[in-house]
């Protein structure tokens, strides 16, 4: 049996379902680039038929990602499969992932069909997808609660129809490792054509078993694991891929399998997903938590000083954690900034050097010394800014006392400068009142977060907001050494997204009227 475990990442599809607001196309592309650097084999980029935004995201990622195979999800419905193929066709090679429910409760209460009908629908869907690509994956939704006879029948039929990967999801996180491993083992024992497909698993974490179930499945013969970075996902989340990768690396002698993951990219990828998704990583999380390599016990510290292996089964360096060297200042040139970006593994097509260098100089003038993590934060925020941003903050002045604060701003609105001043319950409130007055948008803030990016009193601060506008939620991000300015950038990020959506809607309406 092949000892290579395929890593299938669904952060951009299943993981995004956990977010308060959808990621933008640019945000998804940043994450896709990071997953490609990480060495992920398959990137499930979205569900194209679900929305125009998802279609565009899948299409954009398929066009730009070269070293990982891009995949799109579809129900076992022809129009879904057609939409997936249309979005993916710009890729050199791609995968279509189609699925249907197989558990008794899903078949009877959700689909309201006979099992014979469901098998026929699955076969038809796989054959339809094979018209577009040889790489078709079929998932038995809620396989963990599917009667084993029915599951074996469905798997055999899907393989005969042309599926080359069969995914066995524990959709509601119901099983335990011995049980789930037994399901995989039974499939290998009872499905006659099982050798013609790779068996994949997709485990949810409702009972905290997703990683353990996935490892049990590998031991039973599964050779693809699906999951997300940091384990983000619907309800309690998905199998955390960074944990799977490090378990396989650390216990390779026991498990006898490998992955193509570049382990020293794990920490950076985890932080990026956390930042763009506005989902903090719990400090005690395995592998990537802030305390994952901390030792506070005196007995442990004594042992570590004598021999690190006494209490450390893996090193911080193995996931890419390293001490940050300080060697960039306002006197550093573009070549020095580019050299640091190169050393961190970023390709030139992943960022705009001119925009990054401009932001770097502003930061260096403020704090004097710039670390690699500062550059990364600046790059991520710079990438989120659109060249066609209608609203841009040109000037900000704050006067704050113990009771009220006054803020004055100059805002570029499509090139025209507008000024406003306001009083509020603190500088951020006053700033937001100014922006609301100039732009005319009535926005409800659902969530406001401030987090430190980097170290020290002069470190960067990141503002994240979730805003509600006409029933739709938007995520805005801002980064600055000044948290008031970062807060303003976050709101303008949202307002520019709303403005672009309004412009697109107006164009569509004009086309519709012209057609009529």
Swiss-Prot record:
Signal sequence residues: none
Top EC category: transferase
PROSITE patterns associated with the record: AIPM_HOMOCIT_SYNTH_1, AIPM_HOMOCIT_SYNTH_2, PYR_CT
InterPro entries the UniProt entry points to: 2-IPM_HCS-like, 2-isopropylmalate_synth_dimer, AIPM/Hcit_synth_CS, Aldolase_TIM, LeuA/HCS_post-cat, LeuA_allosteric_dom_sf, LeuA_bact_synth, PYR_CT
The keyword Glycosyltransferase belongs to this UniProt entry's keyword annotation: no
Cellular localisation: Cytoplasm
Cofactor: Mn(2+)
Entry's Gene Ontology cellular component terms: cytosol
Pfam families associated with the record: HCS_D2, HMGL-like, LeuA_dimer
Region (Regulatory domain): 392-516
Sites where the protein binds Mn(2+): 14, 202, 204, 238
Keywords per UniProt: Amino-acid biosynthesis, Branched-chain amino acid biosynthesis, Cytoplasm, Leucine biosynthesis, Manganese, Metal-binding, Transferase
Residues annotated as domain Pyruvate carboxyltransferase: 5-267
Example GO biological process: L-leucine biosynthetic process
Main location: cytoplasm
Reactions catalysed according to its record: 3-methyl-2-oxobutanoate + acetyl-CoA + H2O = (2S)-2-isopropylmalate + CoA + H(+)
Gene Ontology MF annotations: 2-isopropylmalate synthase activity; acetyl-CoA C-acetyltransferase activity; manganese ion binding
Family under the similarity heading: Belongs to the alpha-IPM synthase/homocitrate synthase family. LeuA type 1 subfamily.
Quaternary data: Homodimer.
Known function: Catalyzes the condensation of the acetyl group of acetyl-CoA with 3-methyl-2-oxobutanoate (2-ketoisovalerate) to form 3-carboxy-3-hydroxy-4-methylpentanoate (2-isopropylmalate).
Name of the protein in question: 2-isopropylmalate synthase
Organism per entry: Vibrio cholerae serotype O1 (strain ATCC 39315 / El Tor Inaba N16961)
Name of encoding gene: leuA
């Amino acid at each position: 049996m092949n000892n290579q475990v395929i890593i299938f990442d669904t952060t951009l599809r299943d993981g995004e379902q956990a977010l308060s607001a959808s990621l933008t196309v640019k945000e998804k592309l940043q994450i896709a680039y990071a997953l490609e650097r990480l060495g992920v084999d398959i990137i499930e980029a979205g569900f194209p038929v679900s929305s125009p935004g998802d279609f565009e995201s899948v299409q954009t990622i398929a066009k730009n990602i070269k070293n990982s195979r891009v995949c799109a999800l579809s129900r076992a419905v022809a129009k879904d499969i057609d939409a997936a193929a249309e979005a993916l066709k710009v890729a050199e090679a791609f995968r279509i992932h189609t699925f249907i429910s197989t558990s008794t409760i899903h078949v009877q209460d959700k689909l309201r069909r006979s099992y014979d009908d469901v098998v026929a629908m699955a076969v038809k869907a796989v054959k339809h997808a094979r018209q577009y690509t040889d790489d078709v994956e079929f998932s038995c939704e809620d396989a963990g609660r599917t009667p084993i006879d029915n599951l074996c029948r469905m798997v055999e039929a899907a393989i005969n129809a042309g599926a080359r990967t069969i995914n066995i999801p524990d959709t509601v996180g119901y099983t335990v490792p011995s049980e789930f491993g037994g399901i995989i083992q039974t499939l290998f024992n009872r499905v006659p054509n099982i050798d013609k497909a790779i068996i994949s698993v997709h485990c949810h974490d409702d009972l905290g078993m997703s990683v353990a179930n996935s490892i049990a499945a590998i031991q039973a013969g599964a050779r693809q694991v699906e999951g997300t970075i940091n384990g983000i996902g619907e309800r309690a989340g998905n199998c955390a891929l960074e944990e799977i990768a490090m378990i396989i690396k650390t216990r390779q002698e026991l498990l006898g399998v490998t992955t193509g993951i570049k382990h020293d990219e794990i920490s950076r990828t985890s932080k990026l997903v956390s930042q763009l998704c506005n989902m903090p990583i719990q400090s005690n999380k395995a592998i990537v938590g802030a305390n994952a390599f901390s030792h506070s016990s005196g007995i442990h510290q004594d042992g570590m000083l004598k021999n690190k292996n006494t209490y450390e089964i893996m090193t911080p360096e193995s996931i890419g954690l390293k001490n940050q060297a300080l060697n960039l200042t306002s006197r550093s040139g573009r070549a020095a900034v580019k050299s640091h970006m190169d050393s961190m593994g970023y390709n030139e097509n992943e960022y705009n050097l001119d925009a990054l260098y401009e932001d770097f100089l502003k930061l260096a003038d403020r704090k004097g010394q710039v670390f690699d993590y500062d550059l990364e934060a600046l790059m991520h925020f710079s990438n989120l800014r659109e060249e066609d941003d209608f609203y841009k903050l040109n000037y900000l002045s704050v006067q704050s006392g113990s009771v009220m604060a006054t803020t004055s701003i100059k805002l570029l609105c499509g090139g025209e400068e507008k000024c406003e001043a306001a009083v509020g319950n603190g500088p951020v409130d006053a700033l937001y009142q100014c922006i609301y007055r100039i732009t005319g948008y009535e926005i409800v803030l659902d969530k406001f977060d401030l987090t430190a990016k980097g170290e020290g009193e002069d470190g960067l601060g990141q503002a994240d907001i979730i805003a509600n506008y006409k029933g739709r939620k938007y995520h805005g991000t801002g980064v600055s050494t000044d948290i008031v300015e970062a807060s303003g950038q976050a709101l303008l990020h949202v307002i520019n997204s709303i403005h672009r959506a309004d412009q697109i809607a107006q164009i569509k309406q004009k086309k519709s009227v012209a057609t009529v």
